[in-house]
Amino acid sequence: HIDPQPELQDPYQRLLSVIEGNPEQVLNKLIDLGQSSQVFTNHWQVAQRQTAKLLTQYQAPFSEFSAMQEILKKVPKDIQIHLSNSMPVRYANFLGIAPSKTRVWANRGTSGIDGSNGTAVGHALSSDQLSLLLTGDLSFLYDRNAFFHNEDLSHMRIVVFNNFGGGIFDLIPGPEALDPAEKDKFLTTPHQKDLSHSALDLGFDYEKCINSSELNAI
């Protein structure tokens, strides 16, 4: 951890070492140390190319994953993307985003999903670039007040992957050991909210896609 302050907060007790100093200056010093071995980088790039090739052969019914794959293939180069918790950032990390002028942002709130909309709005308001928020239904619904203002968001687009609850808890290890009723009540929190009502209330145009053809038509 690099920080100009000698006294640091470490609530998770996970810091192994602390470098006291200005982060930018310290990192510039590391650059001056010279070129390190490229062996690891080369292996990583080979694996990345192999994975990218496999992903082009991916065939499955329309799903959140395939939708994310299509979206990332078609986003403009000069754009900033904000990834919310929990599945959107995992999908994007797995699929990868092609190197370009794209700026990628993400944040994790205390409970994971909280604050994603607000952070994305802040990035949109601080830039003239087209901004794209890729988020889940719970993340979007949890932080709707982030759009309750009179600022211009005409250059912002929002894609909500709506699986009507916390779909992440069906994929990660641990929650399957819970009683199903407890899991639904405290983790998955299933719902039947119609997000078109939120879009209308917030003054956004709304499109719903339930297959690849509808997604590609937008």
What are these regions (language model features)?
Residues H1-D3, G21, E64, I81-N85, ...:
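General beta-strand structural signal in soluble alpha/beta enzymes
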Residues H1-Q45, N150-E151, I172-P173:
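Glycine-rich, acidic loop regions that bind phosphate or pyrophosphate groups
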Residues P6, N85-M87, N163-G165:
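Glycine-rich beta-alpha junction loops
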Residues D10, K29, E70, R90-A92, ...:
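Phosphate- and divalent-cation-binding pockets in alpha/beta enzyme and binding domains
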Residues Y12-Q13, S17-E20, L54-P61, K185-T189, ...:
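Hydrophobic alpha-helical scaffolding
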Residues P23, S37-W44, Q48, A60-M68, ...:
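Generic structural signal for well-ordered, non-membrane alpha-helical segments
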Residues Q45-D128:
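Active-site diphosphate/adenylate-binding microenvironment
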Residues F94-I218:
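Thiamine diphosphate
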